[in-house]
């Protein structure tokens, strides 16, 4: 998949107000409220904005933080990192490589084998599950 370039107006038409606030304006959903924070379903988490495959449920774990947490992305080229100095903190923001949607942040307090915690807003994701007939579905 190549780079996705859309105007703010196009994103506003395609996303819910909450999805737009989080993915395009770098917002954060309240902890323990997002659709996927406690989901145990198996599948692939894709970018809500462009559909790029980002994380496998095999890398998801319960970090106790209230947001979906993963110890690694599907591969190193699907997510870009940027320094985030907002809110009086120094953090590393993670964005979708293809459309630059704000996903969340990555922290160095995760489990092995990476020691990383990709803390992601549910509104930035969509879970693509596998049905018994192996066809991909979006719940």
UniProtKB/Swiss-Prot annotation:
Record family assignment: Belongs to the MsrB Met sulfoxide reductase family.
Cofactor binding note of this UniProt entry: Binds 1 zinc ion per subunit. The zinc ion is important for the structural integrity of the protein.
Highest taxon, organism lineage: Bacteria
Cellular component GO terms held in the UniProt record: cytoplasm
Naturally occurring in which organism (per UniProt): Acinetobacter baumannii (strain ATCC 17978 / DSM 105126 / CIP 53.77 / LMG 1025 / NCDC KC755 / 5377)
NCBIfam families: peptide-methionine (R)-S-oxide reductase MsrB (TIGR00357)
HAMAP family with a match to the protein in the record: MsrB (MF_01400)
Lineage, broadest ranks: Bacteria, Pseudomonadati, Pseudomonadota, Gammaproteobacteria, Moraxellales
EC annotation from Swiss-Prot or TrEMBL: 1.8.4.12
GO molecular function: peptide-methionine (R)-S-oxide reductase activity; zinc ion binding
Protein's UniProt keywords contain Oxidoreductase: yes
Protein name as catalogued: Peptide methionine sulfoxide reductase MsrB
Binding site for Zn(2+): 47, 50, 96, 99
Residues the record marks as active site: 119
Entry keywords, A to Z: Metal-binding, Oxidoreductase, Zinc
Gene3D superfamilies with a match to the protein in the record: Peptide methionine sulfoxide reductase
Domain MsrB as annotated: residue spans: 8-130
Protein's GO biological process: protein repair; response to oxidative stress
């Amino acid at each position: 998949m190549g780079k996705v370039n859309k105007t703010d107006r196009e994103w506003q038409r395609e996303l819910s107000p909450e999805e737009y606030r989080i993915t395009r304006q770098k917002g954060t959903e309240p902890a323990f409220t997002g659709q996927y924070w406690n989901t145990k379903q198996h599948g692939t988490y894709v970018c809500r904005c462009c559909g790029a495959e980002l994380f496998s449920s095999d890398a998801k774990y319960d970090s106790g933080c209230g947001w979906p947490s993963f110890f690694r992305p599907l591969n190193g080229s699907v997510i870009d990192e940027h320094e985030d100095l907002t809110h009086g903190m120094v953090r590393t923001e993670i964005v979708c490589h293809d459309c630059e949607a704000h996903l969340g942040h990555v922290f160095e307090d995760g489990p092995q084998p990476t020691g990383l915690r990709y803390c992601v807003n549910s509104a930035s994701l969509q879970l693509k599950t596998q049905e018994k007939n192996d066809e991909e579905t979006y719940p």
